[in-house]
């Protein structure tokens, strides 16, 4: 029987977390008990919101633990610390990182695991084919996706919602990029031939508006690019040389905008690449204040 850990980072969104846990538990009711041993690890990123008392009886999930962090480190670093904790403290076959807010749909867990059982030596990513956000966010996300392809050569259609075999977890916890960008690190550490995907529809948040602001989307995009900073630097230089050659004799404030944009992007990505700190990552479990057991 496969031992599966669902990894959920959370910051001040306990209502969504418990809604997600209830939906996962109810969804597992129809599963044969011999299919998988599924437990949950929640990484509490030093939430200021008090965790509510749970009144729901979990029947299908085998265990639910909450790691309480001393200091807030951010979403990506919560996942990184969670992967490290699972690797060092748990016997597991697969890890499934999920966002707590409902945008990673628990209804797709079965599809994800079926694919993982079919291809046990591959990472399974949930690639977005449909998003639930408004037009402006969708446009910005599309721009992020194509800029990432153009300047890094990486087509990253997935977020945190993935199914990671043990080999992938071991590779990711030994790479500093995981401390800054989960999806960027996955693309870097696991070869494309060792990855496959399922089609995924982005769910709607259980409660409240999305916390992914325009600024956070830019930071997210640049953090992915920063993982491939050498490729980014080379392609940016090629772009700038080619573009300057094409506009020579027609230089104006308007034609200089793309140059300034690419230079700004490059500098910002290089600054963000300094977040990839292996020493901090290795010591991340020292940030654990306590561990609570919900089940």
Map each language-model feature to its residues.
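Short beta-strand/loop segment that forms part of the nucleotide-sugar
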Residues: 32-47, 67-68
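Acceptor/aglycone-binding surface of glycosyltransferases and processive sugar-polymer synthases
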Residues: 69-71, 75-85, 97, 103-180, ...
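Cell-envelope/extracellular polymer assembly enzymes that use nucleotide-activated donors
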Residues: 3-5, 39
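A conserved acidic beta->alpha catalytic loop
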Residues: 41-53, 102-103
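Short acidic donor-binding loop at the edge of a beta-strand
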Residues: 90-94
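Catalytic donor/gating beta->alpha subdomain of glycosyltransferases that bind UDP-sugars
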Residues: 170-232
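Terminal low-complexity segments of carbohydrate-biosynthetic enzymes
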Residues: 231-295
């Amino acid at each position: 029987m496969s031992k599966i850990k669902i990894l959920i980072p959370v910051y001040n969104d306990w209502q969504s977390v418990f809604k997600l846990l209830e939906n996962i538990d109810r969804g597992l009711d129809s599963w044969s008990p011999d299919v998988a041993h599924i437990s949950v690890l929640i990484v509490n990123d030093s939430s200021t919101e008090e965790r509510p008392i749970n009144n729901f009886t979990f029947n299908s999930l085998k265990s639910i633990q909450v790691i309480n962090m001393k200091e807030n480190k951010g979403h990506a670093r919560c996942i990184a610390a969670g992967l490290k904790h699972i690797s060092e403290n748990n016997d597991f076959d697969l890890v499934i990182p999920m966002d707590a807010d409902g945008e990673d749909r628990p209804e797709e867990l079965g599809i994800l695991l079926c694919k993982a059982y079919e291809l046990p030596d591959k990472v399974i990513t949930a690639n977005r084919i449909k998003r639930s956000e408004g037009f402006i966010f969708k446009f910005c996300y599309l721009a992020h996706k194509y800029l990432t392809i153009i300047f890094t050569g990486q087509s990253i259609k997935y977020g945190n919602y993935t199914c990671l075999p043990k080999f992938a977890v071991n590779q990711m916890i030994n790479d500093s990029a995981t401390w800054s960008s989960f999806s960027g690190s996955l693309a870097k550490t696991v070869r494309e031939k060792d990855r496959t995907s399922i089609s995924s529809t982005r769910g709607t948040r259980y409660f409240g508006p999305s916390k992914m602001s325009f600024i956070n989307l830019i930071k997210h995009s640049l953090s992915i690019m920063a993982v491939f900073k050498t490729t980014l630097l080379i392609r940016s230089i090629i772009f700038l040389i080619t573009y300057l050659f094409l506009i020579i004799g027609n230089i104006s404030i308007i034609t200089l905008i793309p140059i300034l944009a690419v230079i700004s992007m490059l500098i910002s990505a290089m600054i963000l690449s300094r977040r990839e700190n292996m020493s901090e990552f290795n010591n991340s479990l020292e940030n654990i204040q306590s561990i609570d057991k919900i089940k």
